[in-house]
């Protein structure tokens, strides 16, 4: 936040201690020294000299270690600054002459505050000893009151957050003596589906904390704050936080600079012209570490204020974060944003539209159609977020003057053709209503209780992400800056809210939109730009392979097998996409595997050097890595890439959640749709219903499918089979049809319910030999696979007997993935349309995808 370096802050604290000691006539300490991040001083006031050591870390004052020469093994770990530590030791020595007093003090404080700490999950020391030490730390100049020197604009912004989101949406920790404050903004992510949250390693019942470290007394006029992003329960391993932290730091830095040019307060409060000074300004360069948990939240799963004025929280979120800028040549309106509920249908609206230059329609309804004519005469205004219906004062809106109101912006620059395309799909009725070329507007529907999590992202249909059948990159709507009409903190929350649902659409390093043929996928990843690849692999952004193998070894085993199949295919030039981007471990400035200089033989050599995943689970990972590095230094980096480049969420299903009729132990839950597509899918499902069907494809194709999604291969170089029934994704309710597309019937026979019992017995015998740990991993390189998908039963679904064609990729979502090895056969007579089969599928899905 523009403050002094760590060393300067530490030196200032040490100088305070030395100056304070020299000013005392009967000082108990001498020989003050500081070197190698360790501050030492010697107690000389007793019969025995004792040396105390304070070792500071990189995140000082957090993780500060205190020990004495009398007891080196008993070390105190504290978050207090050096002056506080020194004062407590001196105070206790005068009372007890206990040379290990610093440790006893800490024990005492922890005991006294243990109850409060458990309730608040924060480090707050309120004992009398703390007050004494704080008086020393603050120089005794003031009896510190946390509210005394807080900047008035900060007060106003905090009030705006609490009013809009509820009292638990923001918490802060003040350090008045060092002119610092930690502002924790609690971002609700409960709208994410459980499986999507798991794929992103996010706890959806716990808010994401965006912490701002800024000046308590200067606020927007002070230095640019630093930003931290975390969840309390996943602080150690929160991969999404790296991406979001960089996004929020960039946003805060840009908006902070603009704030310095604007000293006005939009809340109507008069700011004092008197310059506010913080007590003990010599500590102004100190700043607390972000490691403190936010006060009042801790492990409590407190959510944001669920309802306000009768509108659900997710609907409010949609209303605040989403809008569209419609390009129309026959309208004078330049910016027409509609959310939440629409105006009542009124033929006069078309005529009145031409008088509007620029306005924003928010998610609150006008009281009646009769009053819209009066409302539309306003030339430039923003409608209040609070509901007008039921408020008699709104009947007099003819006297309204142009004014600022509480609108939010999620710009998306949709063209007219896109809007009509959305309307034709009947997906606008719930969340988006705009008919620029018609005289009537569709009614918005109030979300019911069951669809509250849906209402946030279902309203992003065609806005947060383009149609997956389009080759256009995502729009920059998620990057649009919300209007600051409720203060900087509300603006920051809104920006975080609109970025989180679409993090997967942007590179985790450069934050530029991914450009994929089939639209965004589920898991966030890095783009193919070389600088981003270097940063991703060398700066520790991606997860370690060891972590993935520890939590999902069978999935890693499958990913490696798919990579091998694609690489061994005679069609590898076409289907081995993406090609690896791997930094050379011996030369971090070069790419060992470069998509621009493809060398398939070298990749295969490295792949052959990867130790089997089963062996990795049976020995220390570091030893396995050393063996791989010795055999081929590119083997382990390639394994890292195979894991991190996977953009789908795959989980090995436990035995009790497997589909028994599929006759294979290798069953996986497979989700590849991002939140926006999944929400579009559920909205379409509510309109048309859905069913299940198989999709067969050679195992060599799945390396690309997991990273690019199911694509329409018809009439492209990816097409392997004929497209007799037109362009689209081919599915079948019959397993025998899809088994054929997977190539299973070429080298092995598909079993049937009517075959002799001897065939089934031999199959069962081969499977029974692979029990225990060995059966969890793939034993053969001759693999066949089949996917079970959920498909929307809309008029767009073309059924040609047992072959179905889906031209719209948004109407197909993968749910399960089944792998067969040599000796394993599937049932050719499975029909997903049979009641028993369909019921079993729904049982296994359960609540995992929120589609059952």
UniProtKB/Swiss-Prot annotation:
Enzyme's top EC category: transferase
Keywords of this entry: ADP-ribosylation, Glycosyltransferase, NAD, Nucleotidyltransferase, Transferase
Post-translational modification (record): Auto-mono-ADP-ribosylated.
Gene3D superfamilies linked: 3.90.228.10
Annotated signal sequence range: none
Pfam family, one: PARP
Catalytic activity, EC: 2.4.2.-
Gene Ontology MF annotations: NAD+ poly-ADP-ribosyltransferase activity; NAD+-protein mono-ADP-ribosyltransferase activity; NAD+-protein-cysteine ADP-ribosyltransferase activity; nucleotidyltransferase activity
Biased segments, Low complexity type: 757-775
Catalytic activity: L-cysteinyl-[protein] + NAD(+) = S-(ADP-D-ribosyl)-L-cysteinyl-[protein] + nicotinamide + H(+)
Modified residues (ADP-ribosylcysteine): 332, 366, 375, 394
Source species, domain of life: Eukaryota
GO BP: protein auto-ADP-ribosylation
Comp. bias regions, Acidic residues: 123-134
Keyword field contains Nucleotidyltransferase: yes
Keyword Transferase: yes
Family: Belongs to the ARTD/PARP family.
Annotated PANTHER family: POLY ADP-RIBOSE POLYMERASE FAMILY, MEMBER PARP
Protein name: Protein mono-ADP-ribosyltransferase PARP8
Natural source organism: Mus musculus (Mouse)
């Amino acid at each position: 936040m523009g403050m002094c370096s760590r060393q300067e802050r530490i030196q200032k604290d040490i100088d305070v201690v030395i100056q304070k000691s020299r000013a005392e006539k009967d000082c108990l300490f001498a020989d003050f020294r500081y070197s190698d991040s360790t501050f030492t001083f010697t107690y000389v006031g007793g019969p025995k000299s004792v040396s105390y050591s304070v070792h500071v870390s990189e995140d000082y004052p957090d993780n500060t270690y205190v020990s004495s020469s009398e007891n080196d093994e008993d070390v105190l770990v504290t978050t207090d600054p050096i002056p506080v530590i020194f004062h407590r030791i001196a105070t206790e020595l005068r009372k007890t002459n206990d040379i290990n007093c610093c440790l006893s003090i800490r024990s005492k404080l922890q005991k006294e505050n243990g109850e409060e700490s458990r309730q608040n999950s924060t480090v707050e020391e309120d004992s009398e000893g703390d007050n004494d030490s704080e008086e020393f730390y603050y120089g005794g100049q003031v009896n510190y009151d946390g509210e005394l020197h807080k900047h008035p604009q900060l007060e106003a912004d905090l009030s705006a957050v609490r009013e809009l989101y509820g009292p638990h949406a923001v918490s802060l920790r003040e350090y008045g003596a060092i002119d610092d404050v930690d502002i924790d903004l609690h971002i609700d992510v409960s709208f994410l589906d459980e499986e999507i949250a798991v794929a992103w390693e996010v706890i959806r019942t716990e808010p994401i904390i965006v912490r701002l470290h800024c000046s308590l007394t200067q606020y927007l006029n002070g230095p640019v704050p630093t930003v931290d992003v975390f969840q309390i329960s996943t602080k150690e391993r929160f991969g999404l936080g790296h991406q979001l932290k960089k996004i929020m730091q960039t946003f805060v830095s840009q908006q902070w600079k603009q704030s310095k040019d604007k000293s006005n307060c939009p809340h109507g409060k008069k700011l004092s012209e008197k310059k506010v000074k913080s007590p003990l300004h010599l500590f102004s360069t100190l700043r607390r570490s972000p490691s403190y948990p936010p006060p009042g939240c801790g492990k409590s799963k407190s959510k944001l204020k669920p309802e306000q004025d009768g509108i659900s929280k997710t609907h409010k979120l949609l209303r605040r974060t989403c809008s569209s800028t419609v390009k129309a040549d026959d309208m004078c309106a330049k910016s027409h944003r509609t959310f939440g509920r629409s105006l009542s249908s009124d033929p006069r609206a078309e005529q009145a539209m031409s008088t509007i230059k620029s306005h924003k329609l928010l998610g609150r309804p006008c009281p009646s159609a009769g009053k819209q004519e009066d409302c539309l005469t306003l030339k430039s205004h923003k409608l209040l977020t609070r509901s007008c219906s039921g408020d008699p004062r709104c009947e007099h809106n003819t006297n309204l003057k142009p004014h600022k109101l509480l609108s939010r912006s999620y710009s998306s620059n949709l063209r007219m053709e896109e809007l009509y395309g959305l309307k034709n799909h009947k997906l606008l009725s719930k969340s988006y209503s705009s008919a620029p070329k018609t005289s009537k507007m569709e009614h918005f529907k109030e979300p019911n209780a069951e669809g509250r999590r849906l209402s946030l992202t279902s309203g992003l249909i065609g806005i947060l992400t383009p149609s997956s059948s389009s080759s256009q990159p995502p729009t920059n709507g998620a990057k649009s800056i919300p209007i600051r009409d409720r203060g900087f903190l509300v603006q920051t929350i809104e920006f975080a809210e609109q970025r989180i649902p679409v993090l997967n659409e942007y590179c985790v390093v450069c934050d530029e939109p991914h450009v994929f043929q089939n639209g965004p996928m589920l898991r966030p990843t890095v783009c193919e730009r070389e600088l981003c690849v270097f940063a991703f692999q060398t700066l520790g952004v991606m997860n370690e392979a060891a972590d993935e193998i520890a939590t999902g070894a069978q999935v890693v085993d499958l990913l490696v097998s798919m990579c091998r199949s694609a690489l061994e295919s005679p069609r590898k030039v076409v289907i081995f996409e993406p090609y690896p981007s791997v930094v050379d471990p011996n030369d971090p400035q070069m790419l060992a595997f470069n998509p621009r200089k493809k060398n398939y033989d070298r990749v295969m050599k490295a792949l052959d050097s990867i130790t089997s995943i089963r062996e990795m689970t049976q020995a220390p990972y570091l030893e396995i890595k050393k063996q791989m590095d010795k055999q081929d230094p590119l083997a382990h980096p390639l394994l890292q890439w195979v894991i991190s480049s996977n953009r789908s969420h795959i989980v090995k299903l436990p035995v009790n959640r497997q589909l028994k009729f599929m006759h294979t132990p290798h069953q996986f839950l497979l989700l590849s749709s991002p939140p926006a597509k999944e929400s579009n899918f559920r909205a379409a499902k509510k309109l048309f219903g859905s069913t299940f069907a198989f999709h067969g494809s050679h195992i060599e194709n799945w390396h690309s499918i997991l990273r690019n999604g199911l694509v329409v291969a018809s009439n492209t170089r990816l097409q392997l089979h004929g497209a007799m029934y037109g362009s689209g994704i081919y599915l079948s309710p019959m397993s025998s049809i899809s088994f054929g597309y997977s190539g299973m019937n070429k080298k092995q026979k598909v079993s049937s319910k009517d075959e002799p019992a001897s065939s089934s017995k031999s199959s069962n015998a081969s499977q029974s030999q692979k029990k225990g740990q060995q059966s969890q991993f793939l034993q053969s390189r001759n693999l066949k696979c089949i996917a079970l998908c959920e498909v929307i039963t809309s008029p767009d679904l073309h059924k040609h007997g047992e072959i179905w064609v889906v031209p719209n990729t948004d109407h197909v979502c993968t749910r399960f993935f089944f792998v067969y090895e040599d000796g394993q056969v599937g049932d050719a007579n499975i029909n997903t349309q049979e009641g028993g089969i369909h019921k079993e599928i729904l049982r296994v899905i359960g609540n995992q995808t929120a589609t059952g």
